[in-house]
Swiss-Prot record:
NCBIfam families: GroEL, PRK00013.1, PRK12849.1, PRK12850.1, PRK12851.1. GO terms for cellular component: cytoplasm. Residues 525-547 are annotated as: Disordered. Residues 531-547 have a biased composition (Gly residues). The gene is groEL. ATP binds at residues 30-33, 51, 87-91, 415, 495. Its EC number is 5.6.1.7. It is found in: Cytoplasm. This is Chaperonin GroEL. It comes from Chromohalobacter salexigens (strain ATCC BAA-138 / DSM 3043 / CIP 106854 / NCIMB 13768 / 1H11). PANTHER family: 60 KDA HEAT SHOCK PROTEIN, MITOCHONDRIAL (PTHR45633).
């Protein structure tokens, strides 16, 4: 086992604090509407320009192992806040730095670290309750657009597009962010259920101009197997042909004789049909076929439940108002499924979302919920260069997380004002002893830090503006974008309550751990350098002429 370096008490805490400060100083320049950019080197390709706090934090690794531990712990603050609320990473980092700096001073002055931590925890818990009582529900499109604008660093167009997308697909809908092809940002909304499988043969196409299959009021046959024998399909085809309606077939695959016969009958006009493959793979394919069946009021023909294709009749088929198929996608619009069955299916998938630990599975399950309950919106980000595209896409994703958080837990006055308002309400909070009360004071002082940093980044004098905001009441605060004071709700400077709450809780939690650290252990770098070196290359003489 390699030898270790061990640092104790003041020496350990000082090194850790240095790491905290290096990381926080790099991250906090991005805070607020006038935050600066940070340029990140990439081992391949061009550097990345970002104003996203968590992206900056993730890039930082320090040479000194003890300083690096401090930096990594603050990185955890940013990551945790990002995971919970999707934004607020820079605010959380600024709060953590302030609590750690002031807390370390208290410990150095001889205060009890555990009592300081208890005081900090007490202040954070009280502040969280105040945030909840201060928050206002965020339901109208205007407020949602304002939250999106703030999170996208003051880009109004992004805020409006997100509000528009949320209105169109609802709270359950999925909104994805893609890179666009032009200079303009665009919003594309897919109504109904769309999946990424197109028609199996171009001979099914009904609209030659758009090369699309369009089936009006069709029957839908869902089959959980490969169809290659036409005899299996004949009973259903004959029944559908008699009814005079079109038929859409969604199966694992259709090939050979079955596909050829289907194409010939369609071209002759005997039956109007089109076929596509079922979406997904393995168990996910079965689940998605079941989703489609419930949405359209049909039954999946599956031998697993003792139902063969020869036994299928019109009662087993689903139906929809319209089905369209392109070369890549199939869309089912206005399925004839029973509302109660669809809701039950959505609840079932939601329960699976709660249970799953895989981010990939969770994302796929959420997509299924959206396809059943809401819809899917795609925001295509436009920009002049690839640099700008990547930076803008990251901002749009941040803004999207923020607006979701705002709809979930409401909004509070933005620009660091909410924490200053709460600080005023908690001035009389006292601990069980003097050290705990000092811990409370540390947390309350830290609550000014985000506003101070926003003002500093905007090039103004922090103390003057903080005192002016403290003297005000309610939603009165400072708008760093315009340099004006006033009602922040009227100005559209809003923060999601969930983001402010998560930032404070994450910062308080990790900073409390740092203050109560008494020893740090790391690998000894000298030990590694001494052993494991490459052998002497003495036998390489005679190669001097290669210089």
């Amino acid at each position: 086992m390699a030898a270790k370096q061990i640092k104790f008490s003041d020496d350990a805490r000082k090194r850790m604090a240095r790491g905290v400060n290096v990381l926080a100083d790099a991250v906090k320049v991005t805070l607020g509407p006038k935050g600066r950019n940070v340029v990140l080197e990439k081992s391949f390709g061009s550097p990345t320009v970002t104003k996203d706090g968590v992206s900056v934090a993730k890039e930082i690794e320090l040479k000194d192992k003890f300083e690096n531990m401090g930096a990594q712990m603050v990185k955890e603050v940013a990551s945790k806040t990002s995971d919970v609320a999707g934004d607020g990473t820079t605010t959380a980092t600024v709060l953590a730095q302030s609590i750690v700096t002031e807390g370390m001073k208290g410990v150095t002055a001889g205060m009890n670290p555990m009592d300081l931590k208890r005081g900090i925890d007490q202040a954070v818990d009280a502040a969280v309750k105040e945030i909840q009582s201060l928050s206002v529900p965020c339901t109208d499109a205007k407020a949602i657009a304002q939250v999106g604008t703030i999170s996208a660093n003051g880009d109004k167009r992004i805020g409006e597009i997100i509000a528009d997308a949320m209105q169109k697909v609802g709270k359950e809908g999925v909104i994805t962010v893609d890179e666009g092809r032009g200079f303009e940002d665009e919003l594309e909304v897919v109504e109904g259920m769309q999946f990424d499988r197109g028609y199996l043969s171009p001979y099914f196409v009904t609209n030659q101009d758009t090369m699309m299959v369009e089936l009006e009021d069709p029957y839908l046959l869902m089959v959980d197997k490969k169809i290659s024998n036409i005899r299996e399909l004949l009973p259903v085809l004959e029944a559908v042909a008699k009814s005079g309606k079109p038929l859409g077939i969604i199966a694992e695959d259709i090939e050979g004789e079955a596909l050829a016969t289907l194409v010939v009958n369609t071209m002759r006009g005997i039956v109007k049909a089109a076929a596509t493959k079922a979406p997904g793979f393995g168990d996910r394919r079965k689940a998605m076929l079941q989703d489609i069946a419930i949405l359209t009021g049909g039954t999946v023909i599956s031998e697993e439940v003792g139902l063969t294709l020869e036994q299928a009749n019109l009662d087993h088929l689903g139906s929809a108002k319209r089905v369209t198929m392109s070369k890549e996608n199939t869309t089912i619009i206005d399925g004839a499924g029973v509302e109660a069955d669809i809701e039950a299916r959505v609840s079932q998938i939601r329960a699976q979302i709660e249970d799953t630990s895989s981010d990939y599975d969770r994302e796929k399950l959420q997509e299924r919920v959206a396809k059943l309950a809401g819809g899917v919106a795609v925001i295509r980000v436009g920009a002049a260069t690839e640099f700008e595209m990547k930076e803008k896409k990251a901002r749009v994703e941040d803004a999207l997380h923020s607006t979701r958080a705002a709809v979930e837990e409401g909004v509070v006055p933005g620009g660091g004002t909410a924490l200053v308002r709460i600080l005023n309400k908690l001035v009389d909070l006292k601990g069980d002893n003097e050290d705990q009360t000092h811990g409370i004071a540390i947390a309350l002082r830290a609550m000014e830090a985000p506003l101070r940093q926003i003002v500093t980044n905007a090039g103004q004098e922090a103390s003057v503006i903080v005192n002016q905001v403290k003297a005000g009441e309610g939603n009165y605060g400072y708008n760093a974008q315009t340099g004006e004071y006033g009602d922040l709700f009227d100005m559209g400077v809003l923060d999601p309550a969930k983001v402010t709450r998560s930032a404070l809780q994450s910062a308080g939690s990790v900073a409390g751990l740092m203050i109560t650290t008494e020893a740090m252990i790391a690998d000894d770098p000298d030990e590694k350098e001494a052993g494991g070196g490459a052998p002497d290359m003495g036998g390489m003489g005679g190669m001097g002429g290669m210089m």
